[in-house]
């Protein structure tokens, strides 16, 4: 307390000056002696996009416009950074923010980590003190577009959590922490252990306004900001620019003094109200400078100190007499508190506007103006248009003239040398502004209007090496050496890009190589597999191809099938011609019988063959010119007697002529057209013909009567009936044995060749459906008794009883009904069928014919 009240012994004007300094720290009058370490925050940068950076160890932060209402829709932020190892303590002194349930309308937050809230407050209750755990904090304030209140005012203090000793204006807490003395006994725990409020418990309750007697007529009641008790102060302390009351009641609602003037000279001076004393809060002044000359006006602020509390005080300078925002030259605030400040207009007119809020005050400013090329009466010209300097600026080690005239011919230096300061150290002109300090205080590198060759002139009148320009590093301090730099890719970037591209190319080549290798391996495996299959196919192709359909028909291995699948119409016509040629040569007619049985045993075949042999169904040849003995026929058709002419001679086929083939009977539909000679089929029919020829006792060979030549034949000797029956039985047994041998031989050949065409000979097909087999049956011209020694008779005569017995279908309901002969017009449709009989006609005549085994034997 001694440190604080010792200044009260000074005269009154010194006390007022001290109180003005104390206004910078609310609630901490002891810090007035260290005002350069006290921060008073305004809104010049706090309510922008970036937070206001604060490095002072203590200070005051208020909401915009405090103690008036804060504006709507505003966002302000402050970032306080203390020294490493220190903590920050915040004490709220006034707080009035629009309240809500979760403080989501208007709010104040304190964050130890960015964007991570640790403290949020709103409403009208003063929040408790906040003690940080780190050496930095973020303070954010937000208001919506609705109701506005008075706002907040807080004081912060940074220091270590435990100090061995505290200053005389500080209080040592029980935990070793130091806080300002003003925070003691304020009903708030700034120490963290409540030790700053323990002694106050023994004192009486804080006095209230009713406990005091009314003040005199020339006094006013005030809660002293120093003693924290109510007292009476003289009226002269009101609106004097000094804060005496804790609630600022002595400096609120004061009348604003009038200031400003119209300046019309080539040069002049002006200053803030009460300069060098504090200007009154709420000052609003405007100076209009009109030199009447077209030349530029140079405006210099030789001293400048503004208050930054609340919205902050400011000075705006316009190019011209009008307050045109587009012609605003510069705005000076409390952050520009340094001298000298120079502003140059583009014409002979300037408008200067000074505005101060109603909270606190400062020393203000002092300014001079002059037309370019003129000097003030008390100044010395630098020469030319280089400006002016005063006698106090002569030989002070600082170049006020760009040409250094104020620092030449100094007594302590030789000619063409300049002093570093008033201590006698000098340096030559060649060492001026070459980015190398020759003076201990570095004055040879300050206020450089020109730089030595090889150096770059910065906008802040500094010089750096030209090689440092556009090197992505701020060497000037204001970033002017990195402005308007061309985009040049550094060498290391190019090197990295080349190396990276080479590596990528190598990886791409490796990937392509691996892909090609895998592809070649896959194709090799594929070729190996395909080569094996090709060899197998080649082996199959080297085998002998199966006989064609025509060859099989010519060899008699298969009968001609009309519905055999073909590949083209030409092939169908060739097969049809071949079938007609064979039928024409053999004198057969086609009969289609259903074939169903596939697996008859050999003994049934022998029996059927013997039965067919008895009925004469295998007799395909007869002697030429023989008379056929008539026989009784059981057929429904009338008996037909005609001379049966042989297609094949017993001796040779050479005796046959084309005329005999043209005149022969047996082919339905008339005489067949001349066709190429076909090889007679080598079948069981030839075997039968050979057997008949060998067993015949005919010694004389018959000849064909052709071209008027008579052919003589020897009549066979008469045979008794008993011998005829015995011979017939022996002949049938012989033919049966030969048929067994022929069947066994064909079965062995079928086991070696299982082609679909060979399966037709064995009665086996690849399908399970019933197939139709066309059977060639010779047509007999007459009927006679069967003679085993007579090879001229056909073995099968459809007109005879034996033939009718073979053709008689099986009918369970009417066994006596037999279909009519195949020769002649069909009884159902009236058309002569030359080849294939339609199914509609077969439904009547062949519905219940013999079994498939018998039909196969007929083939």
Curated annotation (Swiss-Prot):
Bilayer topology annotation: Single-pass type I membrane protein
Gene3D superfamilies listed in its UniProt record: Low-density Lipoprotein Receptor, Spermadhesin, CUB domain
Topological domain ranges for the Cytoplasmic compartment: 514-859
Domain CUB, chain residue ranges per copy: 47-159, 259-372
Disordered: region residues: 623-678, 693-723, 748-770, 801-823
Range of residues in the leader sequence: 1-32
GO cellular component: clathrin-coated pit; membrane; plasma membrane
Domain of life: Eukaryota
Glycosylated residues (UniProt): 75, 146, 284, 366, 409, 441
Disulfide bonds: 47-76, 103-122, 166-178, 173-191, 185-200, 215-232, 222-245, 239-254, 259-285, 375-388, 382-401, 395-410, 413-426, 420-439, 433-448, 451-463, 458-476, 470-485
Subunit record text: May interact with RACK1, ZFYVE9 and NMRK2.
Name of the molecule in the record: Low-density lipoprotein receptor-related protein 12
Name of encoding gene: LRP12
């Amino acid at each position: 307390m001694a440190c604080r009240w010792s200044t009260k012994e000074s005269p009154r004007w010194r006390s007022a000056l001290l109180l003005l300094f104390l206004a910078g720290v609310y609630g901490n009058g002891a810090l007035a002696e260290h005002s350069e370490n006290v921060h008073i925050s305004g809104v010049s940068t706090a309510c922008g996009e970036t937070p206001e950076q604060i490095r002072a160890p203590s200070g005051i932060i208020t909401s915009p416009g405090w103690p008036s209402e804060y504006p709507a829709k505003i966002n302000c932020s402050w970032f306080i950074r203390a020294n490493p190892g220190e903590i920050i303590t915040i004490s709220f002194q006034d707080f009035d923010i629009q309240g809500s349930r979760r403080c989501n309308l208007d709010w104040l937050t304190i964050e130890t980590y960015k964007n991570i809230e640790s403290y949020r407050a709103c409403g009208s209750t003063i929040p408790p003190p906040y003690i940080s755990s780190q050496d930095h904090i973020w303070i954010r304030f937000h208001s919506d577009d609705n109701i506005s209140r008075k706002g907040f005012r807080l004081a912060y203090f940074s220091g270590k959590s435990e100090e061995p000793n505290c200053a005389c204006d500080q209080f040592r807490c029980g935990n070793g922490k130091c806080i300002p003395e003003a925070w003691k006994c304020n009903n708030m725990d700034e120490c963290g252990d409540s030790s700053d409020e323990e002694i106050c418990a023994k004192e009486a309750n804080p006095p209230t306004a009713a406990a005091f007697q009314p003040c005199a007529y020339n006094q006013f009641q005030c809660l002293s900001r120093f003693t924290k008790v109510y007292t009476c102060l003289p009226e002269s302390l009101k609106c004097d620019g000094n804060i005496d009351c804790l609630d600022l009641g002595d400096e609120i609602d004061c009348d604003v003094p009038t200031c400003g003037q119209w300046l019309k000279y080539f040069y002049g001076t002006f200053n803030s109200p009460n300069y060098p004393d504090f200007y009154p809060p709420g000052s609003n002044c405007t100076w209009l400078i009109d030199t009447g000359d077209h030349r530029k006006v140079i405006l210099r602020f030789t001293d400048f100190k503004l208050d930054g509390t609340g919205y902050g005080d400011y000075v705006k300078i316009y190019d011209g007499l009008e307050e045109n925002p587009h012609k605003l030259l510069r705005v000076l605030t409390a952050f520009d508190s340094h001298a000298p400040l120079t502003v140059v207009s583009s014409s002979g007119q300037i408008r200067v506007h000074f505005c101060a809020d109603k909270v606190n005050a400062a020393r203000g400013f002092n300014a001079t103006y002059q037309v370019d090329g003129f000097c003030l009466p008390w100044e010395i010209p630098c020469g030319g248009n280089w400006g002016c300097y005063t006698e106090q600026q002569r030989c002070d080690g600082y170049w006020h003239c760009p040409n250094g005239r104020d620092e030449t011919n100094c007594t302590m230096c030789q000619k063409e040398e300049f002093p570093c300061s008033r201590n006698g150290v000098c340096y030559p002109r060649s060492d001026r502004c070459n980015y190398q300090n020759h003076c201990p205080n570095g004055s040879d590198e300050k206020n450089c209007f020109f730089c030595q060759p090889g150096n770059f002139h910065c906008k802040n009148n500094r010089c750096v090496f030209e090689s440092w320009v556009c090197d992505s590093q701020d060497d000037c301090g204001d970033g002017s050496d990195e402005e308007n730099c061309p985009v040049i890719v550094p060498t290391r970037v190019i090197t990295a890009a080349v190396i990276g591209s080479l590596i990528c190319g190598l990886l791409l080549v490796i990937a392509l190589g691996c892909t090609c290798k895998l592809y070649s391996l896959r194709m090799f495996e594929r070729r190996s597999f395909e080569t094996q299959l090709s060899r197998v196919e080649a082996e199959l192709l080297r085998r002998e191809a199966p006989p064609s359909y025509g060859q099989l028909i010519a060899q008699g291995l298969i009968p001609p099938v009309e519905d055999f699948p073909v590949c083209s119409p030409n092939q169908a016509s060739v097969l049809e011609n071949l079938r007609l040629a064979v039928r024409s040569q053999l004198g057969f007619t086609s009969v289609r019988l259903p074939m169903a049985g596939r697996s008859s045993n050999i003994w049934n075949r022998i029996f059927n063959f013997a039965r067919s042999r008895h009925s004469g169904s295998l007799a395909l040849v007869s002697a030429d010119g023989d008379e056929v003995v008539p026989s009784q026929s059981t057929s429904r058709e009338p008996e037909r007697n005609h001379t049966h002419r042989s297609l094949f001679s017993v001796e040779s086929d050479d005796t046959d002529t084309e005329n005999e083939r043209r005149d022969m009977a047996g082919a339905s539909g008339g005489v067949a057209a001349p066709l190429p000679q076909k090889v007679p089929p080598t079948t069981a029919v030839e075997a039968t013909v050979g057997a008949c020829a060998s067993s015949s006792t005919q010694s004389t060979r018959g000849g064909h009567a052709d071209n008027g030549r008579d052919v003589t034949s020897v009549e066979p000797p008469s045979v008794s009936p008993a011998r005829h029956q015995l011979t017939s039985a022996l002949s049938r047994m012989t033919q049966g044995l030969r048929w067994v041998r022929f069947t066994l031989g064909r079965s062995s050949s079928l086991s070696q060749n299982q082609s679909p065409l060979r399966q037709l000979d064995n009665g086996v097909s690849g399908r399970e459906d019933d197939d139709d087999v066309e059977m060639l049956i010779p047509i007999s011209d007459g009927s006679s008794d069967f003679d085993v020694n007579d090879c001229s008779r056909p073995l099968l005569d459809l007109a005879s009883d034996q033939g009718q017995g073979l053709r008689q279908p099986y009918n369970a309901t009417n066994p006596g009904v037999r279909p009519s002969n195949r020769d002649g017009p069909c009884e159902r449709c009236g058309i002569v069928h030359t080849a294939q009989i339609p199914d509609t006609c077969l439904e009547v005549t062949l519905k219940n014919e013999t079994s498939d085994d018998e039909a196969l034997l007929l083939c």
